[in-house]
A protein has these predicted regions:
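N-terminal, post-signal peptide beta-strand-biased segments of exported outer-membrane/organellar beta-barrel
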Residues: 16-124, 325
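Residue-level detector of alpha-helical transmembrane segments in integral membrane proteins
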Residues: 10, 58, 266-267
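Bacterial Sec-dependent N-terminal signal peptides
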Residues: 1-25, 431
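Outer-membrane beta-barrel porins/channels
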Residues: 21-46, 111-431
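Single-residue recognition of alpha-helix boundary sites
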Residues: 13-14, 75, 180, 297
């Protein structure tokens, strides 16, 4: 019980850390809920987010809560991860670089009863973080210049508690219940060199608190003692969020200093989409595991508050065509030559993955950015005098986010996750 209390303290600490960080520098995070997070742990990230069909006794796979029933009965698992990334932004021949590092997740799991596993943790849902400007002239003789400044920060996190049960041999079901919270604060400033033109600022903000429920199913089909296939499926409930969005328009006369502001509020402004996922994992002798995943986030039926000004008639209202359904396809796997071998290199898990995702944003009537990514990494066992089951998960990931009409992003990311796998529940025999 003391060790479980320590783990809970660690989880609270990492929760507070996560609340203070943003995991992106992308200008695309100025739209919608921001840049959607992968919601994967260290071993998933090396396979580019693959996991709906995976069942691991020594890893926490919160992509599918049905997998918790496979947790080893003698251990308590605690897994936390961080990432660092370098992104190159390019548009119309202009290129910029930006660095970013962030806390990613902290999760834990243990066997509650026979064929029943429990997991809890904190994972990101979305990230908002950008700061850039654009300048030019409003007339051909270049006598009046302008500077437009775009800033934003925020994001959403979720704390979950999940359970996985294997009621029938080779059939597991599970559920994750999550509390989600977060906010976003965005601003657009328009400043002019001509003192007769008022400067204009727009401020968008929201504070969101809601819940999320995700279900999972896994069916393992053994062909013989060395080969099997696990089929996985997930479903997440969609529902309205009873929180408001606010937009404030501030006009400033630079000659007199007089300010005029107008505030708009949209009630019940948000909604979580339904999510559907399916996956398959082929397992050969617990050495080679390869799989494919497909996921669908039904954003198209989700409105979002948008400010518009048509010939001086300003409004802040829900746009029913703001989002698009997001489809993601993932392929990957891992190979471990000999998990219990005396040769160190044979005990390492070698992982790879690739994925393609369609955009979930509809920006000014045009498709937002699609995403292509590949990854590779290692699961390195950590040896000490009392435990050889903990794992250091390291992976590298390249992500290309682009659209024909907008900025292209190329991101190189390093992910580091440390899985503590302790034998807390072993009964020691005294002779």
């Amino acid at each position: 019980m003391k060790k479980i209390s320590i783990a809970i303290v660690m989880m609270v600490f990492t929760t507070l850390t996560a609340m203070a960080q943003s995991g992106t520098n992308s200008p695309y995070s100025q739209y919608g809920f921001g840049v959607l997070a992968d919601q994967t742990s260290g071993f998933n990230r090396a396979m580019n987010g693959l996991g709906i069909g995976f069942r691991e006794p020594n890893q926490v796979n919160f992509l599918n809560p049905a997998s918790y029933s496979s947790i080893d009965s003698l251990t308590f698992i605690f897994d936390a991860g961080v990432s660092g990334q370098l992104t190159n932004f390019s548009e119309n021949g202009v290129k910029k670089n930006a660095k970013n590092a962030s806390f990613e997740y902290a999760v834990a799991a243990f066997r509650l009863f026979k064929h029943v596993g429990l997991s809890f943790g904190i994972v990101p849902f979305s990230n908002v973080g950008y700061n850039y400007s654009a300048s030019g002239y409003i007339n051909n003789d270049k006598t009046t210049g302008y500077v437009n400044t775009y800033k934003g920060e925020g994001g959403m996190r979720q704390v979950y508690l999940g359970i996985g049960v294997e009621p029938i041999k080779n059939v597991s079901i599970g559920v994750n219940g999550s509390y989600m919270w977060g906010d976003y604060n965005r601003s657009i400033g328009n400043a002019y060199t001509d003192g007769y033109i008022n400067n204009l600022s727009k401020y968008y903000s929201a504070d969101i608190r809601t819940y999320r429920v995700d279900f999972g199913l896994q069916l393992t089909i053994p062909f013989d003692k060395n080969n099997s296939v696990t089929l996985g499926a997930t479903y997440g409930l969609g529902h309205k969020i009873n929180d408001d969005a606010q937009c404030t328009i501030l006009s400033t006369n630079t000659q007199t200093g007089v300010k005029d502001s107008t505030t708009f509020v949209v009630e019940n402004a948000f909604k979580l989409p339904q999510t559907i996922g399916g996956g398959l994992m082929y397992n050969h002798r617990n050495k080679l595991k390869v799989g494919v995943d497909y996921s669908l986030q039904k954003w198209a039926s989700t409105p979002f508050p948008v400010y518009s000004d048509n010939n001086g008639s300003a409004s802040f209202s829900l746009n029913e065509n703001y989002f698009k359904d997001r489809h993601k396809f993932t392929f990957g796997g891992e190979y471990c030559p000999g998990q219990y071998s005396r040769r160190f290199l044979s005990r390492i898990h070698y992982r790879f993955g690739a994925s393609y995702a369609t955009p979930y944003l509809n920006i000014n009537g045009q498709d937002g950015p699609k995403e292509i990514s590949v990854s590779a990494g290692f699961g390195i066992p950590i040896m000490n005098t009392y435990n050889n089951r903990s794992i250091l998960n390291i992976s590298a990931q390249w992500v290309r986010t682009d659209s024909k009409s907008f900025i292209t992003e190329n991101t190189f990311r390093i992910n580091i996750g440390l899985t503590f796998n302790e034998r807390w529940f072993m009964k020691w025999k005294v002779e």
